[in-house]
Structures are given as structure tokens and as C-alpha cells.
């Protein structure tokens, strides 16, 4: 019997494994809950040795459980910290190895569900209909339905969702018009590729859609549809072509993007078939769609090949950032773009490590997760430190050789989960082939233990600075109080070049004066920018300059954007310069933020646990 490798699950998934899940839910906007049933088809991993099935749950109202259509003995045990409450179901006679049993669980979500956010019509752009969406990563699927909530278990899915409004889910829509049942319609989806529970996703609201590629559509509010289509349609197929050339053909059938309301807490969530995306990517300049390259890359790294626990999360994100940068360099037809993006990422990594402290457990590539909530460890570290490890292997063996390893790795592990050591074994096994004998000495010098377990920054590579040299030169000019800026300084730059410039200025030992900060905002049109990435970076400079005229703008932005990348960093800085405004701004917008975001900002501001 295989060991349980994931410390963030209470399930006995080494004794029973979910093979198929059927989620049959009514979206109740009045009660703000999902109600209905799930059927879990679990395969016995022992020969009648296990007499109970243990599932993860968190604040779920379970009303009945049947085992193979027969009422069963079951109980929901007391809550055990962030892991939630185990649901224990008796299987008195056990089951033979390989035998499949069916558990049908009747349930409703509660107001303590951490995976769902419910928006009133007033919180949507056209004010016509309510909206609901899920965010299950890392361990929030258990707050929707009892399950084996671990990335080490993968299941195929059927979704049957009844709602008065349009529904999308992480499966391919079943052909045909949704059936009408009273005021509701029944939306059906099928997911043929086995996925872990954190990729379970559902959303419902006033949603319209439009084509953006040969197998891709964008879905969003009717008011935002035209702008969202324009933002994405030029690059979607290019991204897909580039990704398929690097790895192998796309496995999921469709690739669609749901642009969510502003309170969505992440840049994107790689839910299969429908990436859930922040509206901050719709900036009217096609400058922020790197997020889509990242989420598309997850179709191979993370979704097809998955880390077996959150302790090895870097295998999902480090690989994805690497593939994202390969995709972007390919479509820009400029290898310097890879390094350019890596330079921006290095800044994010430095900030994350400074925030935790360079010796903190959470700055390691592989992190101990016993007894902790994986959300608390969330940062740029698995993304950027993971990327730097993958990139170091690429440079060590050479791009031509590494490009042969990429499809081998994803073929070997597709539809499976692995840990860091299995990745190491796969790499060493591949490069032990006679054709790579000249690399033997180089490969023998890889410090695997150090890479996995040393805290702090990894070795810094030599970056190609072609695309950032001008950014550094302009930043240096701003160190002089006599410098006279002009709009032409940045008029030919991409949004990311402007971001690099702002990041450099933000790191000045001596901050700008308030007057300089105001000039920068006006002359480079940053204060009024629709590009939230640039606006947030500028506000960091303004707050460090003690430019009090910028504080109302910061507070306004914090009431319009729920993406944690911006919300948490802006609140931390605002808290340092004007704690009263920071607390008032949070209290005013508390219900606007997603539960995950709300809880983490409360910790950042020292306001106690979320209720």
C-alpha cells in the first residue's frame, strides 16, 4: 500500500482512490449556496483490509450518505485546524483490490464556504444579475463537497448544474441546448481527463461569450465582452501553437477564458477548459495578457502533470513560468524577451524573500506543510525560484538537449502526480542515455538537496539586459532632482519596460520627493492609467515618497481590484504610511474581497482572524 504523501489531506487516499466524480448541484442565489449531491466512485487499493473511507470536508452541511445505494454509517468528525473536518464512512465488508464502490453524498454548502464568492447584482458591471464563482486551490474544494482534497488523486468529472443564469465549469460543455426546469436551466459538462480536486470549478451569472481562436472563446459580462475579445483574439492561437511546439499537442479539446468580476483574488486560475482570469488583464493595450500564456502552459504543467502535494508546488509553477517565458519569447520572435520577463520575476522573488526573511521555511523550493494552511505559504517563491531551477537545468545541458527532455517528462507523468525526488530521478534517468555521456560530469555536480531545501535566493544568473538597459538609464536620471522628464521618455516602451523602470525607482535608497512623484504620475500618465500593473507600481513609489495626494487614489484602487498581487502589497505599504486609512479602506471593502483574500489581508493588517 502506497504511503499518504500529502500532509494537507485527512483522507485515506492510499486505501481508496476517487476515479470518477459526478457533481449535481442547484445554484441557489437566494440562499447563497450550492445544494444537491456528489457521487464519488472510489477504487479499493487494498484487498478488503480497509473498512472505512475518510474524506476531507470543511463547513459542508452533509445530510445523507449512501454506499452502493444503501444507507451507510457515517459521521463528520470535529474540525482539525485548516485541514477541516474528516467525514468517515463505514465500509463494513471492505472491498477487493480494484473493486469500485459508489458513495452518494447529499449536501449543501454553508456561509462559511471558503471556495465560493457570491456577488449581488450591484457588485457586477451591468447590475442585472447576481454572480457566483469558485476558487478551490489550494484546499478549498472540501468546502464545496466532501472529497479526497489532494493533488495526489485525480478523477474524471461530470457536472450537472442547475441555475437561472449561464453556467461554466471545468469540463467540456455537453452538446445541445440546456434543458429548462422551472426558472432554471440544466447545464452539463464532462471532463474526460482526470483532474485533482483543486481544479473543480464552477461559475454562474450574466455571461456572454465570443470566439478568440480556433478552439477558444472568451466568456464574461455582456458589457465587457467586446473589449475582452479584442484583448485576447490576436494572441490566443499564437500562444497555443507555441506551447504545442515546445511540449506536445493540447490534450483538453477546448481552451477558453472566463474573465471574472474584479474581486477575483488571482491573476488567473488554470481551471481546465475555462481559465478563470482577473479583469486586470483587460487593459486596452494587450500588454497584460502574459497571464494567459501562463494559464495555458498549466494545461501541461500542473493540470496534466501535477505535484503530489503543496510541498512540491514548485513543480506546477516553476515549470509553468518556464513554459510561459518560452511561449512569450517565441511569439515575440526575440530570445531577449525570455530574460526580460525573468528580470521582472527576479524582482518579485526578491520581494517575497524579503517579506518572509531569507531563512524562512517558505523561501525553500520544497516546503514542510504539516499543520499549515497552504494559502499562508503562497508567494512568488515556487513560481520564480522554481523557474530558476528549471532554467538552470536548461542551461546546464543545453537548450537542444533540454528540448528533448521536455516532451519526455510530460509524456512520462501525464495524468499522474509526482514529488521533487521523482522529478530528479526522471531527469537523471533521461540524461543517463549514452548520447548524453558528455554531460555526465556536469550533471553530477547538481546540488539537488541544496536546490530543494536551501532557503533564500537561488544563484543569480547572468541576464540578457538588452530590453531593460534603457529602463535602468531613465531610472538613474530620476535620482537627480534637476531632471526634467518628458512623455517621450517612455512613449516607445512596452508596458513591461515601463514596469521595470518603476520597479527600479521603487528600490531607490532615497525615495523620490512628493513633487517628483506627482510629476512622474502626470507626465508618464501613470496616475490615470487603465493598466493596473503600472498604476499599482506607481502608487508604491508615491506612497514611499509620502505623496499624500496619492493616498485617495490608492484607496480607490483597493476598492476596485481584488487581485491579491496588488491588494496585499498596496495594503502593506498604505498601512505603513497611513494605518487609519488602510484599516478604513479594508473595512469599507471587506465584503468586496474574496474570502481567501479577505483572510490574508486581515493577517497582513493585524486585524485578527476572518469571521
UniProtKB/Swiss-Prot annotation:
Q: Which domain of life is it from?
A: Eukaryota
Q: How is the cofactor bound?
A: Binds 1 zinc ion per subunit.
Write one Pfam family the protein is assigned to: Peptidase_M1
Chief localization? cytoplasm
Q: Which residues bind Zn(2+)?
A: 294, 298, 317
The answer to keyword Zinc applying to this record is yes
Report the protein name in the record.
Leucine aminopeptidase 2
Q: Which residues form a coiled coil?
A: none
Asked whether the UniProt record includes Nucleotide-binding among its keywords, one would answer no
Sorted alphabetically, the Gene Ontology BP terms of this entry are: cytoplasm to vacuole targeting by the NVT pathway; lipid metabolic process; peptide catabolic process; protein catabolic process; proteolysis
Species in which this protein is naturally found:
Chaetomium globosum (strain ATCC 6205 / CBS 148.51 / DSM 1962 / NBRC 6347 / NRRL 1970) (Soil fungus)
Amino acid at each position: 500500500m502506497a504511503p499518504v504523501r500529502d500532509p494537507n489531506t485527512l483522507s485515506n487516499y492510499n486505501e481508496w482512490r476517487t476515479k470518477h466524480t459526478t457533481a449535481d448541484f442547484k445554484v441557489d442565489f437566494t440562499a447563497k449556496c450550492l445544494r444537491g449531491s456528489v457521487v464519488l466512485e472510489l477504487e479499493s487499493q487494498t484487498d478488503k483490509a480497509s473498512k472505512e473511507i475518510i474524506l476531507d470536508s470543511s463547513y459542508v452541511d452533509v445530510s445523507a450518505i449512501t454506499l452502493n445505494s444503501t444507507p451507510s454509517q457515517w459521521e463528520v468528525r470535529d474540525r482539525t485546524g485548516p485541514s477541516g473536518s474528516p467525514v468517515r464512512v463505514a465500509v463494513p465488508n471492505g472491498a477487493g483490490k480494484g473493486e469500485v464502490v459508489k458513495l452518494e453524498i447529499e449536501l449543501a454548502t454553508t456561509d462559511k464556504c471558503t471556495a465560493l464568492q457570491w456577488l449581488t447584482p450591484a457588485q457586477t458591471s451591468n447590475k442585472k444579475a447576481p454572480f457566483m464563482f469558485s476558487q478551490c486551490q489550494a484546499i478549498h474544494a472540501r468546502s464545496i463537497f466532501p472529497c479526497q482534497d489532494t493533488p495526489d488523486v485525480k478523477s474524471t468529472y461530470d457536472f450537472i448544474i442547475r441555475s437561472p443564469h449561464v453556467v461554466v465549469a471545468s469540463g467540456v460543455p455537453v452538446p445541445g441546448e440546456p434543458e429548462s426546469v422551472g426558472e432554471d436551466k440544466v447545464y452539463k459538462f464532462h471532463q474526460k481527463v482526470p483532474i485533482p480536486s483543486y481544479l473543480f470549478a464552477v461559475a454562474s451569472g450574466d455571461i456572454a461569450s465570443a470566439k478568440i481562436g480556433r478552439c477558444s472563446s472568451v466568456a464574461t459580462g455582456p458589457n465587457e465582452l467586446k473589449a475582452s475579445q479584442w484583448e485576447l483574439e490576436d494572441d490566443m492561437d499564437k500562444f497555443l501553437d507555441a506551447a504545442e511546439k515546445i511540449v506536445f499537442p493540447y490534450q483538453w479539446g477546448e481552451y477558453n477564458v472566463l474573465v471574472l468580476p474584479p474581486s477575483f483574488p488571482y491573476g488567473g486560475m488554470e481551471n481546465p477548459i475555462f481559465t478563470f482570469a482577473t479583469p486586470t488583464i483587460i487593459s486596452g493595450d494587450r500588454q497584460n495578457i502574459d497571464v494567459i500564456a501562463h494559464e495555458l502552459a498549466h494545461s501541461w504543467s500542473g493540470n496534466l502533470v501535477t505535484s503530489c502535494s503543496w510541498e512540491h508546488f514548485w513543480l506546477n509553477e516553476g515549470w509553468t513560468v518556464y513554459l510561459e517565458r518560452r511561449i512569450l519569447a517565441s511569439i515575440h520572435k526575440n530570445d531577449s524577451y525570455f530574460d526580460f520577463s525573468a528580470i521582472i520575476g527576479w524582482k518579485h522573488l526578491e520581494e517575497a524573500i524579503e517579506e518572509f526573511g531569507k531563512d524562512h521555511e517558505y523561501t525553500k523550493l520544497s516546503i514542510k506543510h504539516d499543520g499549515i494552511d497552504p494559502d499562508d505559504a503562497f508567494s512568488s517563491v515556487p513560481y520564480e525560484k522554481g523557474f530558476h531551477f528549471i532554467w538552470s537545468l536548461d542551461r546546464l545541458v543545453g537548450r537542444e538537449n533540454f528540448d528533448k527532455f521536455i516532451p519526455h517528462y510530460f509524456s512520462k507523468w501525464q495524468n499522474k502526480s509526482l514529488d521533487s525526488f521523482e522529478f530528479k530521478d526522471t531527469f537523471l534517468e533521461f540524461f543517463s542515455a549514452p548520447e548524453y555521456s558528455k554531460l555526465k560530469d556536469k550533471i553530477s555536480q547538481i546540488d539537488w538537496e541544496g536546490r530543494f531545501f536551501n532557503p533564500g535566493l537561488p544563484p543569480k544568473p547572468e541576464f540578457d539586459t538588452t530590453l531593460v538597459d534603457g529602463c535602468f538609464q531613465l531610472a538613474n536620471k530620476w535620482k537627480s532632482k534637476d531632471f526634467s522628464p518628458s512623455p517621450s521618455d517612455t512613449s516607445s516602451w512596452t508596458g513591461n519596460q515601463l514596469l521595470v523602470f518603476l520597479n527600479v525607482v521603487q528600490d531607490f535608497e532615497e525615495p523620490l520627493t512628493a513633487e517628483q512623484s506627482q510629476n512622474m504620475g502626470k507626465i508618464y500618465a501613470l496616475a490615470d492609467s487603465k493598466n493596473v500593473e503600472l498604476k499599482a507600481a506607481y502608487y508604491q513609489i508615491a506612497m514611499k515618497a509620502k505623496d499624500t495626494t496619492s493616498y485617495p487614489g490608492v484607496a480607490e484602487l483597493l476598492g476596485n481590484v481584488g487581485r491579491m498581487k496588488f491588494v496585499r502589497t498596496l495594503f502593506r505599504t498604505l498601512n505603513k504610511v497611513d494605518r487609519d486609512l488602510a484599516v478604513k479602506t479594508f473595512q469599507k471593502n471587506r465584503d468586496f474581497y474574496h474570502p481567501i483574500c479577505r483572510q490574508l489581508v486581515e493577517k497582513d493588517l493585524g486585524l485578527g482572524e476572518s469571521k
